[in-house]
Amino acid sequence: MTRLVVPRIALLAAIQLATAPAEAAAFGPPPGAELKLEKLDAIESFVDGEVAAGRIPGAIVLIQQHGKRVYFKCFGKRDVDAGTPMTEDAIFPIHSVTKTITSVAAMMLVDRGTIALDDPVSKYIPSFAGMKIGVERKDESGKTVLDPVALRRPITIEDLLLHTSGITYGFYGVGLVKAAYGGIYLGDFDNAGFVERIAKVPLAEQPRTLWDYGHSMDVLGRVIEVASGQSLYQFEKRNLLDPLGMTTTKFFLTDPGERARYAQPLAKDRHVERNSLNVTRWESGGGGMVSTVADFERYGAMLLNGGTLDGRTYLSPATFKAMTTDHIGPGAGVARNYYYYPGDGFGYGYGFGIRTDPGNASPPAPGSLGEIKWDGATGVYLVVDRAEDMLFVVMQDSPSGRMHVITTIKKIVYDALEK
């Protein structure tokens, strides 16, 4: 099998440039627009209202343009029960935004030639060689059963990056494959143990046929461990987090001082699957990290600068371009499961939603062509818009109220951009 490293990435970058949407000139704010600070005042009245209504405990909003903070404010409480005000050093569970960090770490290994996009996952996790699709049928008694069906081709590293591996989540949707994920989180396990559990669950569909949100990034985290000879956190800490100054971004909080800074959700939202105050051996590359607004400002700045920051290159230009290319658009032969899909007008790159067109809404949802974004179950939200030389971060621990908060703030931000 030909190794798809830099040549494959360079080809993808060329395709992106050749197929840029014609609507680019007509959609979104004009390139070079500036944020009108007085219009950003609407963020304060909106978030204060959400806090006062008891819909969220608090939040932090940061907006940067041209390398400088143009808006920063802490709202509400870090811990409502204790009456602790929100502070800049509050630590938040970032849940699925972890996936973007895992993707960046994996692409750093691709840049180095350590792994390749077309490597079969079974090269690093041998048990994946025996995986099958689970296809439902009715038996003679009328009972629904699963038939194992062979894969048309192996799952690859690129499939993990694109959520096209056939690996899904069991906590949404119906069917016997979904039900097979029951009990997958029980007991004590590390990344090696978790992927062996995944290997025993039937795939939901053939690889590269459906964008299906699931445990692909957890499997990718284990690939990083095997390929690097380090734990996932060790590799990320040494190669990405520490060099960027993201010193509070980690999987678990063991230091008493850091644990005291953990942003607590409202009582109604204390049902999420993972709690970063519970220290286990599982470093979930799909949703296990915590972070701060300062760390995410650094991370966003690196992405805004195309994979470099302060003279250090984390991703080569070709690799960054490939990460921010839509790989599941028209002609890719990939359908979309819209549960957890990044939204109308978006495609998907390696770990990020990519704005590819205005979408079907009239007027279009706010944003710019080429913007990259992702968010997590608690409402942590990162948007990087290179056309406007802008990034913004929302930090919150508000599972039930998160979407209204992030969509409203995004509209305020883009409404504030004027030429």
Outline where the language-model segments fall.
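N-terminal secretory signal peptides that target proteins for export/translocation
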Residues: 1-4
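Short, well-ordered beta-strand elements
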Residues: 381-385, 389-398
